Amino acid sequence: MIHEITPEILSLDKSVYDEFDILTFDDCLYTQYLNHKHFAKFNKKMIFFLSTNIICPENINQSEQIIYCGNAHKKAFNGNFENYMKLSQIQELSKFYEIGGHGHNHILFKNSVYSFDKIKEDTDIMVSKFKEYNLDLNSFCFPYNQDNTFYKIYVKKLNLQIFGDERIPIESYIKNTKSYKPELKYC
């Protein structure tokens, strides 16, 4: 699982990537778009997980800043989407890679007071947005990599391949660097 694209991640040896069958990118951060060709050279299936309500408007200038995903979320939840991909970029990537679902609003449903109806509503909006955006939806990753029994039940009914906290953060291969943040797995 990859969030931020740091120089340390870009300099990891090919042998690290050989350990993965699939490379997954959470949140559709703009830096992931800028560097997708770097990861394509490892010849792995790649899935970019999209929260359909966190997309940069086409008329906004994007930031190439490497930003912790939690901080990017805070900015997005306050209306600033400059650290995320635009729909046109997501659609471009969909020609070569899979775009998976990551919820509509990127809500943390684990251990929450949210009802099954709220989970269903958020997921149904995500599904309808994928159709509206002409994107195939075959995979799903829980926001913050945290599942919830109701969430799992509903997503399974949609026949989506489910990804969660079983994924290994690529950052775990660079623990001794200043960019390592163990909390990244929760973005």
Predicted ranges, named:
Residues 31, 36-43:
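Aromatic-lined substrate-binding rim segments of carbohydrate-active enzymes
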Residues 2-4, 20, 40-147:
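Metal-dependent polysaccharide deacetylase catalytic core of the NodB/CE4 family, i.e.
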Residues 1-24, 29-30, 34, 116-139, ...:
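C-terminal active-site subregion of NodB/CE4 polysaccharide deacetylases
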